[in-house]
């Protein structure tokens, strides 16, 4: 998860066993991405939108807000920027479904979405871009789960990457809990004539209020329900609790 799957990063880890060297390799890759973004969009907005992905996800907002990253842009230009980013294959787009059911594309909301980085190793480097390189100590704390940060968004990015690699399109769903808060299902999968809601946790925390409420409302539409967390496989009533490495098999 920390190294990612880019060949240059993997080779750097195998050759040096040093996360700082790995991070330098990943920064070179991201610099190439940035150069390509500038060819597509000389204004630099596409590059800024890409770099802002970790920050947008860490806010636990229900959508990516492009205007908070690049300021005021006319709607046609924003549509073009988003299309260019999606076509670049450097990001995985996850669209909101207004009515979660089989045929989720029918109620796909193209104005409400989240963006994930195509490679979680690159995502880690982007998240800690404020340093010249991400030091070994940060990687070690990430490995031991001792970094004082909410890492839920890292696991969301990882799950998004694995779901796309397994041939899934990405969808999510939110609905009001009260006047100020929302329930959220991180990912929705279509399986046969049913759907499978997926919730992602960054620890062994087993609470799943959103999952329970979603399945109560849409009980007739549910095939399986999954909570992805950092412990071993288990089952909590009707909910399958699975570690991230099992995601390709759901």
What are these regions (language model features)?
Residues 1-5:
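Amphipathic alpha-helical segments of the small helical/lid subdomains adjacent to P-loop NTPase cores
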Residues 230-250:
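Domain-level recognition of nuclease-like catalytic cores that cleave nucleotide substrates
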Residues 223-229:
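Short, hydrophobic beta-strand segments that form beta-sheet elements in well-ordered domains
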